[in-house]
C-alpha cells in the first residue's frame, strides 16, 4: 500500500539531488523515506543508502519500489530518527523529508559530521524550526522556495495550475553549490 503522505515531486527531487552533491562511496540517509523515491534516486550515486521511516507500511512500500527499480544498496530501517542511526556509520549526506523530531535530527546529523543535509518542508513551522536549528549550530547555508505549476487544457488553450510550495533548507559543513 502506497504511503498516505505525498511523494517528493520530480522537479523538487532534481533540486534536492543537486544540492546534496552525493559522492561515490558515500553513505546517504533518507530520513522519513515515505515511498522511497528519494532513496531510489540517490542509490546509483552512493555506496549505501539508509531509508528510514517510523511507519511499517512506508518501509514495506519503499522496499517494494526499490526492488522493482533494482536498487540493491538500500538498507531499510524502521524506527525513529535520530536514535535509529545510533551505532551505524554516519551518513555523509542526508535528506530529511519528515518533520518529526526535526531539531534533534539536524543536531544529531551535525554532531556526526554529516557534510550536507537538505530538509524538505511544506509547513512554515517546520521551515522556521529547521532554519533556526541550523543557524544555532552554525551550519545553515541557504533556503529555497520551489513552486511548480503544471499546464492543463482550458477552453482550447493552456493554463497553469500551481502546486503547493516546498521549502528546502540546506545545511552542513560543506559549502553549497
Positions of the model-derived regions?
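Conserved SAM-binding loop of SAM-dependent methyltransferases across substrates and taxa
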Residues: 35-46
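Core SAM-dependent methyltransferase catalytic element
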Residues: 157-177
Amino acid at each position: 500500500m502506497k504511503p498516505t503522505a505525498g511523494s517528493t515531486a520530480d522537479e523538487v527531487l532534481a533540486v534536492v539531488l543537486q544540492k546534496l552533491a552525493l559522492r561515490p562511496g558515500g553513505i546517504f540517509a533518507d530520513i522519513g523515506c515515505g515511498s522511497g523515491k528519494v532513496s531510489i534516486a540517490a542509490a546509483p550515486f552512493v555506496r549505501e543508502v539508509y531509508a528510514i521511516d517510523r511507519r511499517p507500511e512506508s518501509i514495506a512500500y519503499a522496499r517494494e519500489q526499490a526492488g522493482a527499480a533494482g536498487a540493491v544498496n538500500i538498507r531499510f530501517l524502521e524506527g525513529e530518527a535520530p536514535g535509529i542511526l545510533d551505532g551505524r556509520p554516519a551518513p555523509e549526506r542526508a535528506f530529511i523529508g519528515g518533520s518529526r523530531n526535526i531539531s534533534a535530527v539536524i543536531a544529531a546529523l551535525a554532531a556526526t559530521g554529516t557534510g550536507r543535509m537538505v530538509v524538505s518542508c511544506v509547513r512554515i513551522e517546520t521551515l522556521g524550526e529547521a532554519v533556526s536549528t541550523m543557524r544555532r549550530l552554525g551550519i545553515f547555508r541557504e533556503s529555497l522556495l520551489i513552486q511548480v505549476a503544471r499546464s492543463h487544457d482550458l477552453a482550447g488553450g493552456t493554463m497553469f495550475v500551481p502546486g503547493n510550495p516546498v521549502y528546502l533548507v540546506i545545511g552542513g559543513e560543506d559549502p553549497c553549490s
